[in-house]
């Protein structure tokens, strides 16, 4: 009898347990570090009071959780605890949490709001990265440290309380936050690392930065709606690509402290029309203002010493150019494609005009080259300058690169100097208006296609020391080989075209 009663009691206990949990579908689990929780069938996560730590990756990729309640007993959340909880929409946070760790809510794509308490002092690396519906984060004013990628690709984030005590904004911290419209950098911030705000395409106003001394590359790259930018007052250099592709920017004022513009700093700022207070700039890097289509002028200081390659390439509206006397080289493609330039005076201090330096300046009519330091005009330096009419090459020049005046279709006359020993390949290629060129007495060779398609070149005298004429040198040009001197020892079969 006693045995029968015991069996009945056990049966009733089992039945009661099954009944209690079958209706509400709770999953009760006891986990490590004394954290007990339950997830209801409706997706509510309850963590029992008394637990202090949510372990690493405890709920990673859990698709059942929709709402999480984290009680005040919890003081620590370990990294990746809620990573990939793609259906999580709401979190009620413990007010005793001091850190949101690495990957904590990464890729929680349904999370739309996060309210933190002043107890939070650190937001770790990628803590909210990829939370694409997160539109508001509050309670962050006491945060002292942000991690890399902390809010990267939070594409709908519109409100964020910028921490007032953060010294460093790390790389990619807010990259891709396309819905942010304004940002004010706190006074405590002294460093902004690479691409911190890159791709914030809705950002219109960038203020603060007055104490920022170190700028990473590309910090505001592709913030293509930014119209108001306050530059830092404590740095001497604008970093590489820091404001490139800020397409809505029309005016920028350079503070007195900045002396160097880094490579591609303003490249692709298509509507940048005016650069104010550039008097202290001494160096401009590669492509710094390339593709600034609206830029009309740039005032160089007397202390300016260095251009980079393509510094002002494709500045279509640049009408006037006063090249500083403190430089010795105009680098490759420095002013190529500046189609509004009509007149150019190269200072006597310039030693080298590098490859394609003024290529495709299609409205350049007047070019003055001063004798003195200039020794080299390199390959394609003035190629495709279709409005250029006359050129005098100074006596100091002893090197012409290939295609220097290629496709200068309005070029009529060129005076070459006596120091030249060759006419390189394609020097006057397709100069269809060219009528007069003096070939200096020291020239020994005329290169391939040097005078190709020069149909107006009716009268050309060859020097007595000429030895070599390259392929197609005079093809489609009315120059007779009958006038060749006896000194010629090598002439390509098709030098004057094919019969």
Each PLM stretch: what is its role?
Residues 1-11:
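Bacterial N-terminal signal peptides that target proteins for export
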Residues 1-3, 452, 497:
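Short intrinsically disordered, low-complexity coil segments enriched in acidic
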Residues 7, 40-52, 63-76, 86-99, ...:
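Structural signature of tandem-repeat unit edges
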Residues 11-20:
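Bacterial N-terminal signal peptides
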Residues 19-32:
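Sec-dependent signal peptide cleavage junction
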Residues 34-40:
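Short, exposed beta-strand/loop patches in secreted or surface proteins that constitute
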Residues 57, 78-81, 101-104, 124-129, ...:
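Consensus positions within tandem repeat domains that build extended binding/scaffold surfaces
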Residues 57-63:
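Right-handed beta-helix
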């Amino acid at each position: 009898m006693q045995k029968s009663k015991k069996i009945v009691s056990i049966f009733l206990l089992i039945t009661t347990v099954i009944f209690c949990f079958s209706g509400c579908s709770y999953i009760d689990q006891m986990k490590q570090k004394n954290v007990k929780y339950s997830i209801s069938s409706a997706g509510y996560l309850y963590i029992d009071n008394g637990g202090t730590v949510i372990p690493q990756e405890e709920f990673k990729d859990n698709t059942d959780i929709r709402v999480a309640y984290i009680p005040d007993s919890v003081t620590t959340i370990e990294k990746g605890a809620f990573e990939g909880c793609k259906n999580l929409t709401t979190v009620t946070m413990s007010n005793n949490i001091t850190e949101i760790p690495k990957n904590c809510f990464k890729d929680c794509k349904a999370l739309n709001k996060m309210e933190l308490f002043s107890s939070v002092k650190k937001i770790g690396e990628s803590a909210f990265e990829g939370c694409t519906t997160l539109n508001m984060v509050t309670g962050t004013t006491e945060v002292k440290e942000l991690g890399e990628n902390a809010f990267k690709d939070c594409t709908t984030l519109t409100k964020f309380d910028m921490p007032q005590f953060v010294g460093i904004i790390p790389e990619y911290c807010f990259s891709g936050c396309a819905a942010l419209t304004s940002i004010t950098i706190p006074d405590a911030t002294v460093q902004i690392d690479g691409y911190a705000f890159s791709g914030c395409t809705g950002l219109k106003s960038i203020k603060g930065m007055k104490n920022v001394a170190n700028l990473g590359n590309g910090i505001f790259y592709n913030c293509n709606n930014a119209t108001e930018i306050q530059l830092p007052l404590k740095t001497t250099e604008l970093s590489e690509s820091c404001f490139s592709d800020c397409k809505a920017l029309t005016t920028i004022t350079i503070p007195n402290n900045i002396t160097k513009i880094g490579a591609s700093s303003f490249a692709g700022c298509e509507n940048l029309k005016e650069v104010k207070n550039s008097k202290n700039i001494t160096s401009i890097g590669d492509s710094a203002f390339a593709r600034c289509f609206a830029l009309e002028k740039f005032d160089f200081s007397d202390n300016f010493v260095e251009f980079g390659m393509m510094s002002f390439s494709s500045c279509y509206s640049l009408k006037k150019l006063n090249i500083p006397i403190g430089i010795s080289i105009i680098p490759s493609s420095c002013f190529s494609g500046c189609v509004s330039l009509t007149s150019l005076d190269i200072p006597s201090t310039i030693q080298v005009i590098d490859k394609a330096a003024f290529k495709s300046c299609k409205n350049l009519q007047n070019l003055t080259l001063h004798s003195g330091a200039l020794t080299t005009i390199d390959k394609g330096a003035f190629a495709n300058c279709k409005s250029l009419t006359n050129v005098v090459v100074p006596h100091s020049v002893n090197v012409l690169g290939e295609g220097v005046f290629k496709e200068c279709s309005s070029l009529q006359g060129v005076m070459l100097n006596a120091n030249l020993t060759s006419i390189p390949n394609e020097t006057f290629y397709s100069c269809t208006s060219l009528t007069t060129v003096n070939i200096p007495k020291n020239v020994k060779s005329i290169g391939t296609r040097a005078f190709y398609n020069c149909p107006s070149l009716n009268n050309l005298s060859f020097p007595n020391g000429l030895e070599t004429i390259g392929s197609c040198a005079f093809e489609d040009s009315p120059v007779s080989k009958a006038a060749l001197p006896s000194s010629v020892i090598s002439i390509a079969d098709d030098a004057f075209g094919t019969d």
